[in-house]
């Protein structure tokens, strides 16, 4: 009877040890599977997780190793040069790029741009008259009573001279023809001589130079006079508009 009880005790202990061994094996397998799953999950990145960057101060990931974290380093963004530069003057003057330029630019937008008009580069009416009253050949100012004796455009006189037909015997002072003097680069005078009224036209135009040369010189003078008058009118309009704008401000 004692032997049977011992055998039963041995068999019970062996079965319990087998159960313990089996349970330990199951636990080891579970640990291995968990480890393999965790390792595989740490290496496998799905398309949903690709590109995700976590902050360093995130409480869910603050205990991770620093070598596994992606740090965001702030850097200054470089803007393209083409996005800050305004239109160049070559693009503005080009006829192919006129359709790209709008007319909605206001006055503050034009400040500092190539379209800004500097008042230093605009001639006033007085400056234009001073320019027209100067010799284009030697540069002296006829309006200031300056003259060059060896210049054909000056002709030895500034604004007036005695009658060239009778050498001043009639007492009439002839006035300078600015347009003709500038166009022909020779002194031209306008006046009427009391002693010889029939030769006035011959003095105003060069005698003996031919009808063709006289006609071309007269046409050039008329064209220059027209341009000067047009420029004067534009300057007057510009000065009027500038004065009105300054009054509104």
From Swiss-Prot:
The keyword Electron transport does not apply. GO terms for biological process: olfactory behavior; sensory perception of smell. Residues 218-238 form a coiled coil. Residues 1-40 are annotated as: Disordered. Expressed in the third antennal segment. Disruption phenotype: Reduced attractant response to some odorants. Belongs to the pinocchio family. Plays a role in olfaction. This is Protein pinocchio. The lineage of its organism: Eukaryota, Metazoa, Ecdysozoa, Arthropoda, Hexapoda. The gene is Pino.
């Amino acid at each position: 009877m004692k032997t049977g009880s011992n055998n039963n005790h041995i068999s019970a202990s062996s079965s319990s040890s087998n159960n313990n061994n089996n349970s330990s094996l199951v636990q080891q397998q579970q640990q291995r599977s968990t480890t393999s799953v965790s390792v595989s999950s740490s290496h496998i990145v799905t398309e949903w997780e690709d590109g995700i960057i976590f902050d360093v101060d995130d409480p869910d990931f603050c205990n991770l190793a620093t070598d596994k974290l992606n740090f965001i380093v702030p850097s200054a963004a470089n803007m393209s040069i083409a996005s800050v530069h305004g239109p160049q003057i070559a693009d503005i003057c080009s006829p192919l790029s006129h359709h790209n330029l709008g007319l909605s630019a206001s006055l503050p937008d034009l400040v500092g741009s190539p379209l800004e008009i500097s008042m230093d580069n605009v001639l006033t009416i007085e400056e234009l008259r001073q320019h027209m009253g100067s010799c284009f050949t030697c540069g002296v100012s006829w309006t200031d009573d300056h003259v060059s004796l060896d210049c054909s455009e000056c002709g030895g006189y500034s604004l007036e001279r005695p009658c060239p037909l009778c050498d001043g015997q009639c007492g009439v002072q002839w006035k300078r023809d600015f347009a003709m003097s500038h166009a022909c680069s020779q002194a031209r005078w306008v006046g009427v001589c009391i002693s010889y009224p029939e030769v006035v036209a011959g003095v105003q135009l060069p005698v003996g130079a031919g009808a063709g040369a006289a006609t071309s010189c007269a046409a050039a003078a008329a064209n220059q006079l027209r341009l000067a008058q047009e420029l004067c009118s534009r300057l007057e309009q510009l000065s009027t508009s500038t004065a009105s704008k300054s009054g509104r401000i």
